[in-house]
Structures are given as structure tokens and as C-alpha cells.
């Protein structure tokens, strides 16, 4: 059920810096459905339903926490842990350049799982993040299951 919600209801989780709507609009089922269709069309999101792999199930189970997971993973790499900044960034506030770098690094670790997660989930990961935090050149990283598990358990 959560997987279907992620695929068909991106208005529920899209970062407020990507699309900031009054909550009253999302409470109306018809308007919410149209907003979801607009988001799906704007980002050309795949809506095929695929079997859940183990890694996809991990992403789905922790979906709304993936920005915090990314921050934790990136912070581990840079040896920076600042919980208050993680909370600020999660709610769409302004974060430091160092915090942005940590989020970006952690995001790269998440998308490194592209070949192991469903297309629909992969395409939607970036919608969870403040686009400013993702600016910059992509740096490929190797998949690291222990780091992913550690971030999700955190």
C-alpha cells in the first residue's frame, strides 16, 4: 500500500521547496488527484508497478526519512553530525554549505542503488529533497549496503 502511495501520490511527500501548496488543497481528493497528475507529468514519472526487491522494500519502508538517511550517510563521510541542521533541512529550511554537501553526498549514495530498486522509486527519490541541496556536479559512488543499513537504522 505504501509503495502505491509513493508511486501515485507524490503530492504527499514532494519537498516544499519544489512545490509549496496550502494543505487545504491536498485535503480535497479531486484537487489532490489533479496535483498528483501534474507532478507525474512534469517529472515524467514511471507509474509501472514492479515487484519489490529487498532494497526497494528498504527504500519504501523508510521513504519519508530518506533525506535524513542521506544527511546521516553524507555526514558520516565528512565526519559532520549536526542533528539540528538535519531537522532544519528536512523541513525545508536553510542549511549551511557543509550541510548541503553532506546531503548531496548521501543522496549520491542513495541513487547508487539505481540498478537494484524499481524505476518508479528511483525516479521519485529526488522529489524528497530540497533542489538547492542537490545542486552541483554528480560524483558517482559505489553501493555500500552496510552504510545504507546504518543510515536507515539511524
PLM regions: where:
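General marker for long, soluble alpha-helical cores
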Residues: 1-154
Amino acid at each position: 500500500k505504501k509503495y502505491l502511495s509513493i508511486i501515485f501520490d507524490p503530492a504527499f511527500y514532494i519537498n516544499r521547496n519544489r512545490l509549496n501548496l496550502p494543505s487545504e488543497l491536498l485535503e480535497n481528493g479531486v484537487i489532490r488527484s489533479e496535483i498528483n497528475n501534474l507532478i507525474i507529468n512534469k517529472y515524467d514519472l514511471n507509474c509501472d508497478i514492479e515487484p519489490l526487491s529487498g532494497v526497494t522494500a528498504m527504500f519504501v519502508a523508510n521513504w519519508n526519512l530518506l533525506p535524513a538517511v542521506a544527511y546521516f550517510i553524507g555526514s558520516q563521510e565528512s565526519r559532520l553530525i549536526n542533528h539540528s541542521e538535519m531537522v532544519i533541512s528536512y523541513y525545508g529550511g536553510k542549511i549551511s554549505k557543509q550541510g548541503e554537501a553532506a546531503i548531496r553526498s548521501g543522496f549520491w549514495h542513495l541513487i547508487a542503488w539505481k540498478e537494484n530498486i524499481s524505476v518508479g522509486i528511483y525516479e521519485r527519490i529526488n522529489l524528497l529533497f530540497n533542489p538547492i541541496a542537490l545542486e552541483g556536479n554528480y560524483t558517482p559512488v559505489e553501493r555500500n549496503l552496510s552504510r545504507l543499513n546504518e543510515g536507515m537504522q539511524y
